[in-house]
């Protein structure tokens, strides 16, 4: 965005822009401090829950709100009304062009997570206080620098929705108690199993020219002049990984439930043709992270190789990153 220097919630804005949840303006700006209307928030939540900005199925849906007919956001408002996500300013007025507050946004996102507005106390005179408390409990307000009772700026709306993507979904058990929604998934997980010695032939600038599994082979190659420019042998330890199938049960996030979004955390080893370690080779449009598990390195997520990558992340090589990906292989962002 042309005004990216003014954006504080950078990661949230970048991710939601990539997902189409929140968009910039035709002049290339984002206008992070402009406020969000209730209609705009209804659309954002619709896209968050459906992965699409097409709401034609709701164009002719009925509504109790008399002030949304002919409004550009009417289908999104009708959807959110049907899902119990929104409430009106009165029994018949939604006020689509009025700015949305942080408290109202918190309530909408809590219902998106799975809370029942009535059961959770998000209605009545204390709805704002209860919404703020539950939003805090569920991490929706993390890194949000805004007064919740006032009109919500675009960048902080993005931050709240971004937090909701990572929030655990909830449901109600037979006793009416709130429980986290769980899902079971299978994955191939790399575990660090041992360490082996490698012997590199390097030149006078310490650039690696060749690698051998034994000192004897490396010494012979050096003495025989097999590798041009090699001046010495440097030994190093290289980790060996064993890949095993792992089944685990985890809480299902909003991003997983509605957008098939997942995250994997690890050390960025490869971006395109650039690689941090010669043992991690790559071609074009490849991203690889080392997320192997050891006693001192238990990571979130298990996927380590991605091929649908549109952005160059070479500048992050060697850093610990979180990869956000959609479906099974499409990288949305690396943070």
Place the predicted regions along the sequence by residue.
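Feature responds to low-complexity, polar/acidic, surface-exposed segments characteristic
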Residues: 1-10, 23-42, 46-74, 83-103, ...
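Short nucleic-acid-contacting surface segments enriched for D/E, G, S/T with interspersed K/R
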Residues: 305-323
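Beta-strand/loop nucleic-acid-binding surfaces
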Residues: 286-311
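Mature N-terminal segment immediately following signal peptide/propeptide cleavage
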Residues: 13-22
